[in-house]
């Protein structure tokens, strides 16, 4: 709902879909652990794609890391050292990305990274700035789940509310963009 809270009626509808035999998989910019816990407590499919596609959680201690935290940390250190007001955002621990407060000019950071040949991607989810490995996005992460579970594009409905959801929309037959 924009405040980080779960809309209980929406969760109830997702649980009903799960009970009807559909896979309901959370794909988020938040940590995959947060999404996995939501799946457990919410009664949906216990698979989660987090960190904007960089991490897949399928069990309590089973994580597939698609991104490289070391490269993202190097990029953060460079940005922090050269641009004022760069701050880490207090979030649940990440395994593949760095999350920053939206307190600086993102385009300035992009230029700095290009000038220093650091191959990472910056994105703005409107919640935070994210530093991810190249090619890592929600669509890429979810496509790995599609391969694993033999899910066809025609069987995917994606729901999102951020520019970071566009890559997920591209792997789905049907997409719903919410106007939060």
Segments (PLM) and residue ranges:
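Short loop or secondary-structure boundary microenvironments that flank
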Residues: 3-4, 28, 102, 135
């Amino acid at each position: 709902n924009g405040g980080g809270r779960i809309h209980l009626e929406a969760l109830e509808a997702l649980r009903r879909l799960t009970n009807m035999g559909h896979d309901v998989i959370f794909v988020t910019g938040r940590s995959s652990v947060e999404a996995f816990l939501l799946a457990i407590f919410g009664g949906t499919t216990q698979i989660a794609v987090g960190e904007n596609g960089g991490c897949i959680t399928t069990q309590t201690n089973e994580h597939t890391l698609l991104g490289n935290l070391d490269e993202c940390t190097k990029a953060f250190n460079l940005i922090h050292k050269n641009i004022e007001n760069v701050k880490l955002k207090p979030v649940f621990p990440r395994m593949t990305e760095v999350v920053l407060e939206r307190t600086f000019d993102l385009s300035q950071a992009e230029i700095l990274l290009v000038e220093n040949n650091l191959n990472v991607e910056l994105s703005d989810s409107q919640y935070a700035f994210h530093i991810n490995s190249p090619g890592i996005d929600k669509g890429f992460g979810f496509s790995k789940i599609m391969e694993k579970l033999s899910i066809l594009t025609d069987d995917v409905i994606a729901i999102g509310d951020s520019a970071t959801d566009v890559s997920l929309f591209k792997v789905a037959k049907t997409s719903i963009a919410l106007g939060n």
